[in-house]
Structures are given as C-alpha cells and as structure tokens.
C-alpha cells in the first residue's frame, strides 16, 4: 500500500452489467477510473466528488512467478475531493462527516453489490485555546504546533473514521463493524500535508495510519489507509477541455506518452480510501472475476442555522435517507461519454440500471467532437 506522498509547494513529494470496474483475479489485469468535477451537481460538492477508482492485484514484494509478498491480495483505492491545492489551508480538505463513502464489490456478475465497504467520518474538535493577556482564546488553525503521531496533541481537529462491511444490499444487508486492532471501532486519519515545518516527515507520519484489520467472515488479515495522496491521474485537463489545445503530432507521439505538461494536475492532491483485501474474501464460489465501483451518498435534506452556535462544523443539520450523489467505476464514462443532461442522473444511478444510458455508448458524440477540432479526418464511427 505504497502511494506517492501528497505534494507541497516546491516539494516533489457499467454501461452494461460489467460497467463497474472489472478486475480478473486469475489474470494480471487492473481496473481504474477517473472523474473530476464531471457533473453539474457534484461540481458544487467537492468533498463527496469521487475522482478515481483503482482495483488491481497487489504487487508489493511479489516475485516474478507470482508468489511471495502480497500475492493473493487485491488493492482497492477510491479517491475523493479533486484538485486539492497543497496550500489549501487553514482548514484543508477534511471529509464530509454527514456523508458515507463506499466501495462496492459485485462477485456474481449481476451488476449489484454483494459486498460494501462503508467509510464514515467524524471530527474530534479539541478547541485548543491559549492565554492572551488575561483571557484564554481559541486558536484559528488546524494545528497548534508540530505534528508527528496519530491524534497528535497539537491537532486542533482530529479526523477519524469507521469502517463497516455490509453483505448484500448496501442499505438492507447485514452490517459488520471492522475493529481497530488497538481497540474500539474508530481509526485515526492523518491530517493533510500542511508542510514540513508542521510535519517534518509526512511519509513516516502517514505510514502510522496504515492499519492491519480483521474483516468479519474473512480468514485473512486486511489493511486499510485513508489520507491525502498526490494526484495520480496524469492528464492535462486544461489542454483537453480547451478543445484539445495541442498539436496532433504531440498528442499522437508515443515517445511523449508519459510526458507531464506544466499545467497538468500532478501538482494536486486527492484523499484516498485504500483497502487491501485477500481475494478469497471478495470472490464467491468458483468465480474468479469481480467488479468494483465507489459511491458517495449524503442525507436528503440540510437545514442551515442562521445563528450557528460556537463549535466545529455546526452551522447546519441534516436528515432523511442517504441519497447517492457520486458514482465511479469505469474510466471517464460520466466525464466524456454521458451527455450533460444526464450526468447527475448517472451519478445517482446503479450499474444494473445502465441500459438507460446505452445510446451514449452506441452513438458516441466524443469522436465527432474530436473530428471537429482536430485535423484527423473522420474519427466518428459510421457503422451505427
């Protein structure tokens, strides 16, 4: 579970039944996706905006013959909160405590979740105050000094999360709490990478938040980590959305396939929800293929207080059932395939209902748009 350290300034740090991210456990295939601010509604709710979903066979310490190390494990990473600037203080990028974030696994091919790993976040506000003259005054920052350990005393707000495994339907299935090996059912999340004066060794600090856990009903131990990581989606979004504002020769040059332009998003961060689970705990019977996707859901209603009390994140109350507002499985489906009128609908939908979006796949508009802005001839399909 090694991931790039979050960046700081000047530091390198199913449109069908299978349109969920598909990963074969018998073959070395990987599933990945990407979606940043892709729909009108989610663009206004960055804390629940899923940006990427990765699912692949773990390779840490695995020999060429497929043995040793983490062989037999599957890594799942759901990224949220796109385009985080390293200097985005003083509050940085905490997760939405009123939302639930989920990774779903379909292990029988019916485009419905059979397993759901649900993350729920909370903020422990310490209200750190310091004496100023003859009064004690609350500080305005996330931290009151250097930070080096989980739930550091200098953290004014300590972000925590719970992890629940749900077997069957995500709302009506059987729920099992995943416990912290140190006791209880709550895990600490590392504060974002504020900078090297606050956190001298961010990689070492974050590594203290990798937990080895027991998944209920699973004989093999798993690992979980939630925290800020460097953006891994290497696409120059500015150029792409500006009518592909680059020479065709550059775009099609295989020698430049790994080139990162100056205004790419690799200087941004995301928040990763990472799980590493043994394949025997994800599959069903003799089936060796699983599908996976991630969603975020919020309460149906939110009521803002015109005169909020003192406290942390207490300006509103929420209620009602959870409503799905973000969904991500296959790469770029909602971003570049689904039409603008249906992007919010897609984010609220489930894989088993994807037939309603079939026209966007059978009659795609993106090739025609590319033909209109690039001198590459007729790229649009004609065998419709």
Regions found by a protein language model. Give the residues of each.
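Bacterial N-terminal signal peptides
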Residues: 13-26
């Amino acid at each position: 579970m090694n991931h790039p350290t979050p960046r700081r300034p000047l530091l390198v740090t199913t449109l069908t039944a299978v349109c969920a991210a598909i990963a074969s456990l018998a073959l070395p295939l990987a599933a990945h996706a990407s979606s940043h601010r892709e729909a009108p509604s989610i663009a206004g709710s960055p804390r629940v905006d899923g940006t990427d979903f990765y699912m692949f066979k773990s390779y840490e310490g695995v020999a060429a013959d497929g043995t040793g190390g983490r062989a037999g494990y599957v890594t799942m990473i759901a990224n949220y909160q796109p385009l985080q600037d390293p200097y985005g203080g003083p509050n940085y990028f905490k997760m939405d405590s009123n939302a639930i974030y989920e990774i779903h696994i379909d292990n029988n091919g019916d485009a419905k979740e059979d397993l759901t790993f649900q993350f729920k976040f909370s903020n422990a506000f310490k209200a750190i105050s310091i004496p100023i003259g003859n009064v004690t005054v609350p500080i305005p920052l996330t931290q009151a000094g250097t930070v080096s350990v989980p739930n550091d005393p200098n953290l004014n707000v300590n972000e925590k999360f719970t992890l629940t495994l749900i077997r069957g339907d995500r709302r009506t299935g059987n729920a099992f709490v995943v416990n912290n090996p140190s006791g209880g059912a709550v895990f600490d999340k590392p504060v974002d990478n504020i900078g090297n004066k606050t956190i001298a060794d961010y990689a070492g600090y974050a590594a203290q938040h990798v937990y080895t856990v027991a998944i209920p009903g699973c004989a093999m131990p798993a690992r979980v980590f939630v925290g800020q990581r460097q953006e891994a989606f290497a696409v120059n979004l500015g150029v792409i959305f500006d009518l592909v504002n680059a020479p065709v020769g550059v775009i099609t040059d295989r020698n430049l396939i790994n080139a990162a332009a100056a205004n790419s998003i690799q200087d941004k961060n995301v928040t990763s929800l990472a799980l590493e689970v043994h394949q025997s705990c994800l599959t069903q019977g003799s089936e060796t293929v699983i599908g996976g996707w991630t969603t975020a859901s919020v309460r149906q209603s939110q009521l803002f207080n015109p005169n909020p009390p003192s406290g942390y994140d207490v300006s509103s109350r929420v209620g009602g059932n959870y409503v799905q507002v973000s969904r991500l499985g296959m790469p770029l489906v909602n971003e570049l395939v689904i039409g603008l009128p249906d992007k919010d609908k897609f984010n609220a939908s489930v894989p088993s209902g994807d037939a309603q979006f079939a026209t966007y796949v059978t009659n795609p508009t993106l090739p025609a748009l590319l033909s209109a802005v690039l001198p590459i001839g007729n790229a649009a399909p004609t065998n419709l």
